[in-house]
Amino acid sequence: MKLRLLTALLGLLASPALLAQPAPGWVLTAEGLYAHQAETDLGDEGGEFSLDRWYLGLGLDYLWSPRTALGVSVGGGESRYDFGGLTGLAPGEPWGDIEDWNVSLVSRFPINDRITGIVVPSYRVNRESGASSSNADTWGLLAGVSWRLREGLTIGPGVGVFDRIEESTQVFPILVIDWDITERWNLSTGRGLAASQGPGLTLTYAATDNWTLGLAGRYEQVDFRLAEDGPGPGGIGRDETFPLVGTAEWSPNPGTRLSFFVGAEFGGELELADAQGNTIATSDYDTAMLFGAAFVWRY
């Protein structure tokens, strides 16, 4: 399971649409998750791999009103790859444990009675354990506006601009939407904890006052700097896929969310590149099952 979908799930849990708006003042948020990607085969090249992922984050926001806020969030986690057999990417394991550390600022402000703006700059380090942080850092910016067209429907455009390791800056459009289709059905994009690269799309159904079921999907691409003592010294690893998960979320009170998810990753590909970003080898991998749990606590 990759960072961007996982952080999007956390962002969904923490979004104003799902958590009750607190009174003006300071708001503390703690969040975390664990996910497991089951072992899957690496295409025609042979070999297989599995993945375990954990993440913890902490945020502090000051709210002047439900539409005006400024905050900071910090977080970190680890993706533990476990390769088996000859992968075709490298003579041994192409990489091991991947660390992720990030900090982001979140600014939300009203433009007029119906339009709200949001700006989220971020700084991130993605590296294999032992790799240099100075060669593994990237920056990003998410910005957008949302129009409240009517009760239960908010929509608007946005843009994401993200630096990439040894590659050109990536720019992509974003659709911001929060649509109450009925009293129980909702279609929305989460804000994405830690400024993940573009929000995913989630359809939810409020089964009871405390339980919500959902379906979430997004495109994923994660790049990370490799250690100097591996098969690709100082190079770049990439994991690219399209995850789709079903979620079941329990909310015992307005400030607490616990979510369980299960699904699969489709169209996966791993890539190993040298220190300048030139591709050394690639390998597709079969559809992989994934499952896990996430929580958000807000005070």
Summary of predicted features, one role per range:
Residues P91-E93, S188, T202-T204, T208-I280:
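Outer membrane beta-barrel transmembrane domains
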Residues A20-L86, R184, G190, L213, ...:
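Short glycine/proline- and aromatic-enriched beta-strand/turn motifs that initiate or cap beta-hairpins
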Residues D52-L58, E99-L105, P121-V125, W139-A143, ...:
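Hydrophobic, lipid-facing positions within transmembrane beta-strands of outer-membrane proteins
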Residues P66-V72, D113-V119, E151-P157, R184-S188, ...:
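Repeated loop/turn-to-beta-strand initiation elements of outer-membrane beta-barrel proteins
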Residues G32-Y34, G117-R127, L153-D163, L175, ...:
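Transmembrane beta-strand segments that form the barrel wall of outer-membrane beta-barrel proteins
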Residues I174-R184, G246-T256, S283-Y299:
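Outer-membrane beta-barrel "beta-signal"
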Residues P22, Y62-P66, F109-I115, W147-E151, ...:
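Outer-membrane beta-barrel strand-turn architecture
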Residues L42-G46, T87-E93, N126-A131, L142, ...:
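Extracellular loop and loop/strand-boundary signature of outer-membrane beta-barrel proteins
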